Structure formats: C-alpha cells, structure tokens
Amino acid sequence: MSSIPTQNIYDDPKFFKAYSTLPRSQHGFDAAPEWPVLQEMVLKNNKSGHSGIENEHVLDLGCGYGWFTRWARENGAKYVKGMDVSTKMIERAKESEQDLREKGSIPPSYGTLCYEVGDIETVSFSASEIDSYDLVYSSLTYHYIEDFSKLLQQIRLCLKKGSPKDGSRKGGRLIFSVEHPICTAPVNPQPDWKVLPNEDGDGVGRKIWPLNSYSDEGPRVTSWLGVDGVRKYHRTVETYVTALLQNGYVLTGLKDWVPSEHDVEEHPEWKDERHRPYFLLISAEIHSDY
C-alpha cells in the first residue's frame, strides 16, 4: 500500500482552470511534439511481429481529456477504456464523447469506448479484465506514481499473455511516456535554464540545464500552474528499465525525446530543448516465459 495518499491536483478548481489553457489541453496531439514517436511505437511492428491496434482491447491509464482513447477507437481498436484519478478529467472526456455523438461523428463501425474514475496508484482489475488487454498506454502519468514496480505487476496481470510455443497469440504491450529523469532530478528546482557568462566577454550568455541529485530517487515537490505542493517521483532511467525487466517485460523501444532539427526549423523557440531530453518514451511487451 502506498505510504502517501494519492495526489489529485487536477480536481483543484484553480489548477484545472489553468491546465485547461495549456496547448495540450486545447489542441491535443497537435500540441504534443513527442506524439509522432509514441504513435510509431503504438503502430509499428514489435519483436513479436505485432502491428497496429485494429480489433485490440486498449487501456489508457491517466487518460486525461481522452485524446488517446478517441484516437485508438478511430484507428480500429475494438474496446477502449480510459481511467483517471481526476473526476474533472473524466467529466471532460465524457463531454467530448457526447459532443461527438451529438454531431453524428461516431460511425456504427467504431468500437466501444468507456471511462472510469480510478486511482492508478492502487489499481486492481476485475476477473473479466485479467489477461484481456492487448495494449496499456499512458502519457505523462507514471512520474506521479510512488510505487512503479507495484503498478507494473498489476498491468502485467491485465495484459494478454503470449503463446511461447507456436506464437499464435501475441503478448500484450505497454507503452508510456514520462518526464525525463534529467528534468525530474533537481531538488528544489529553480528556473529551468541557467545562463553562464560567455568566455569571450561579449555579453551573450550560454544556457545550461542545471542537474543535481540524479541518483537520489524519491519525491520531488514543486509549484506548477500556480499551485504549490505538486508531487512527482524521480527515478533514473536505469530504474525504469530495471523495473520492467524484473516484472516480466521485454524492452522493445526507448527514446530520449528531444526536438528534431526539422522540429526546430518549424519551431525556432525549441532550439534550446535539443540540449537535453525532455521526455522518456518506452515500449515493452510481456515476456512469454515469465
């Protein structure tokens, strides 16, 4: 059991109002620069030869406004479930779904989509959900989770198990993104970038990313969107990968996400973001012999 009560900052009216103004909230994937890489992870062939999500059962943990759940259904998933600890998030996702229905934008051929308020920190699955999901997806949620290993164990229970002998059934997949550990590491973080004096003395400083306490894992408390006490959990890249391997997963993809040169051409304001990774993107699947 978690030693610290689950944090639910998104139901704070002040925070939720501020969050709703973010580009990601208003424009979804169009404002999520890491999405093309995540999308490729979802759709590409993995080591078991699996491709796409057509007719799959998909679970989105920390679904927020439901951007991914709707995308999964549009791309052929047979059943999609979104879960979030925030009642306000789930209400917003349901409102978007209702808007689509009223506009007649949900063809009869689309699969089932449902939402549930649930605490991912203590998630457990019904008997009908055990060994039932082809894909568990999560975007920018797991760095809020205290016991990542425990969560991986629960997810493994609900993912479909593969057929190791004849390969007739492919193992379920886990794909997720988190804030990169280089970003979550600093204790008492100051403004993101620091400027060093230029050695040439021309007055133009050089930006660096201040990194400290990388190996000291655990909670980090920051202020975000005008709300104090926002709690995240810092883990090293090694810890994320080791937890997967120790809990019966095979690593199939890992990306230290930075903007590409093409991204910077379209968004010059992202130039400094190429100096350090901002997101960690990981794909894995169930180990058939675990």
Labelled PLM ranges:
Residues T239-Y290:
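C-terminal lobe and adjacent flexible extensions of AdoMet/dcAdoMet transferase-like proteins
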Residues E121, F125-V136:
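A short acidic, Gly/Pro-enriched loop at the edge of an enzyme's catalytic core
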Residues D134-S149:
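A short SAM/SAH-binding and catalytic strip from SAM-dependent methyltransferases
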Residues L59-L61, Y65-V123:
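Class I SAM-dependent methyltransferase SAM/SAH-binding core
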Residues G162-P164, R173-T242:
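SAM-dependent methyltransferase
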Residues N55-H57, G172:
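Nucleotide donor/acceptor-binding cores
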Residues M1-I53, W67-W71, R92, D119:
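Conserved class I S-adenosyl-L-methionine
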Residues S149-K170:
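A short glycine-rich, Lys/Arg-flanked "PGG" loop and its adjoining helix->strand segment in the class I
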